[in-house]
Amino acid sequence: MTNRPPSAYRTNVGLMLIAADRRVFVGQRARQPDAWQMPQGGIDRGETPLEAAGRELWEEVGTAKALLLRESREWIAYDVPEEQRPSHWRGRWRGQAQKWFALAFTGNDSDIDVDAHDREFTAWRWV
């Protein structure tokens, strides 16, 4: 088990938001309309992975109506090809190390508002 992320990777959280009928939330990426994904985002300085998960849920999905089911035990690291690395990384990272969170959605569809904050997603659905 790895409790600390590898140093050459940007720390990040991923969220699997699960509805009562066991479908999973996915959002259509604002900057890549052909791409649909689960919410994810970086961990801010001084923030725990769980705190980052709550913040990302609020910023990207527009809700806080969820209960924690499980957190991944290990950091899951992957490399990003050099030509696809964002310029704002400025060579600091070779990829991302993620902690994943399974969350039970406790609200109604009307409690989701992807337009509320960051506008990472232009549309959403349960799959």
Task: Show where each model-derived region lies.
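Conserved N-terminal beta-strand and adjoining loop/helix that marks the start
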Residues: T2-V24, G42-R45
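Short connector loops at helix/strand junctions that flank enzyme active sites
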Residues: R10, P33, M38, R94-W100
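Short loop segments at secondary-structure junctions
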Residues: A19-R22, A30, A104-D109
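Surface-exposed, flexible loop/turn segments at secondary-structure boundaries
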Residues: R23, Q32, E74-I76
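Unchanged
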Residues: I43-V127
